Each structure stands twice: as C-alpha cells, then as structure tokens.
Amino acid sequence: FENIYHIPFIFENKSCLFQMRKRAKYLEIYLYFSVFGALKILIDSQGVSIFTPFAKVQKFLNEHLDFNVSQENKIEPLFVFKRLFDFKG
C-alpha cells in the first residue's frame, strides 16, 4: 500500500472512492462512482488517458472531455481494504 492515497468520500449521498499512486513515469488514479462505475486515469508525458469498462460511459466521456477515453473490461482498485469503512463518522 506504499505511495497509494486512498480516500473514500460521499457524492450525491452515495459512497465513492478515490485512489492515487505516483510511479516514476506516470500518475495512476482509480475512481469509483456509482453513476459511472470504475474509472482508471493515467497521466504521463503523453497526456491523460481514461479507461472505463462500459461502452456508454466511454461514449459519454468522449463527447464531453478532451482526453482519450477507452474501454477496458476489467478495472481493479489499486488495493482493497479488508475492513469496512464507517462513512457516517
């Protein structure tokens, strides 16, 4: 879990997740929203690439963003906690 930021948060009353890991040549971000599902974002010297497992989300994001959005069937979090979070505090 070294060098991975793991931030659960609430968006529109739904649990979401932000994870980020800095590598030598790129930054990797994992986002999970209940509306879009999982998104993987890679930022490197070539620019920003976004990956989603869903064709409809890919189409929507390609229409609204100026980044390369591709479909990738299996997007995994950078790591998974073995215990549940208490979002209510």
Predicted ranges, named:
Residues 1-89:
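Intrinsically disordered, low-complexity terminal tails
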